[in-house]
Regions:
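Conserved active-site and cofactor/substrate-binding residues in soluble primary-metabolism enzymes
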Residues: 3-7, 57-61, 69, 104-112, ...
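Short glycine/proline- and charge-enriched loop/turn segments
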Residues: 38-47, 87-100, 177-180
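C-terminal cap of metal-dependent C-N hydrolases
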Residues: 92, 154-220
Length: 235
C-alpha cells in the first residue's frame, strides 16, 4: 500500500510490535510533495492516496519511519496518464463536463532514484545503505525475488547501477520518455544520476545514455514466497 500519513505509520508500528507480518511502502510524492501541488497542477496532481497538507506532520513521519525500518520499501507508484485524459479536469478534478471520471495517477519512475539520492542521501544525510535497502533489497524480498535480485553476492544476478553522486542537473519533462507529458518535479534541482546500469552482468544503459541490449534480453522471473524485509534503523 502507499503509506501517506503519520497515523497510518503508527498503526503499522503497532501491528509490527504485535508480531503481525505487516510490511508497507511509501512513495517519493508522499515524502516530498504536498497538497499545494493541487493549486499548481490541478488534475495532474490527482493521485491516490491524495497529497497531504503542507503544514502537517506526515512527510517528516514517513522519512523517519523509512530510516528506522518500519517502512520497508520506497516505490514509484508510476501511473502515467496521457495529457488528454487529465486536462478535462481543470475545473473539476473528479469528472469532466460529460461526467466521465478524471483518472488518478502521475509519472514517477524516471525520477524515483535521483530523488531518493538527492533528497534522502545528499540532503538528509541518510546512508547509502538506506537507498539500497528501500529501492532494491527489500522490494526483492517482499515480492519473492530475493536472493536472485536485490543483493550483490555470489549466485545473484549482477543487476547494478553505477552512480555518479556529484552530478547536478534539473529535472525536465522534455528529457523524459514517458507518455504523461509532465512531471510534478519540473524544475527541481537534484544531485546524483545513473552513469551506467547492468542487467545480469551486461551493460544495459551506457554512459552515453544509449541502450545496449535488444528487446528479448529480459527473462521471466519465477517468484518464491516472500522473505521478511530488513528491519531496524539503517546504519
Amino acid at each position: 500500500m502507499h503509506l501517506s500519513t503519520r497515523l497510518g505509520l503508527e498503526r503499522i508500528k503497532r501491528a509490527q510490535a504485535e508480531g503481525q507480518k505487516v510490511w508497507c511502502e511509501t512513495c517519493p510524492q508522499y515524502l516530498l510533495l504536498t497538497d499545494k501541488e493541487m493549486e499548481r497542477l490541478g488534475p495532474f496532481a490527482k493521485i491516490g492516496p491524495p497529497l497531504r497538507p503542507a503544514d502537517g506532520p506526515d512527510r517528516e513521519a514517513l522519512w523517519q519511519g523509512s530510516a528506522q525500518g518500519f517502512i520497508a520499501n520506497v516505490a514509484s507508484d508510476h501511473s502515467p496518464r496521457v495529457p488528454a485524459a487529465k486536462e478535462p479536469g481543470r475545473k473539476n478534478i473528479f469528472v469532466d463536463a460529460q461526467g466521465k471520471p478524471i483518472p488518478f495517477g502521475a509519472p514517477s519512475l524516471e525520477t524515483l532514484v535521483p530523488l531518493a539520492w538527492s533528497e534522502g542521501v545528499a540532503k538528509r544525510g541518510l546512508p547509502v545503505t538506506w537507498m539500497a535497502r528501500v529501492l532494491a533489497e527489500n522490494p526483492a524480498r517482499t515480492f519473492g525475488l530475493w536472493p536472485r535480485k536485490g543483493v550483490i553476492r555470489p549466485g545473484a544476478d549482477a543487476d547494478l547501477t553505477i552512480w555518479d553522486p556529484t552530478a547536478e542537473w534539473t529535472i525536465q519533462q522534455a528529457q523524459h520518455l514517458g507518455i504523461a507529458g509532465f512531471t510534478p518535479y519540473e524544475g527541481w534541482k537534484v544531485r546524483g544520476r545513473a552513469w551506467m546500469t547492468l542487467v545480469r552482468g551486461q551493460v544495459m544503459l551506457n554512459p552515453a545514455g544509449e541502450l545496449e541490449q535488444k528487446p528479448g534480453y529480459g527473462r521471466f522471473l519465477p517468484r518464491r514466497g516472500p522473505t521478511p524485509p530488513i528491519a531496524g534503523a539503517v546504519a
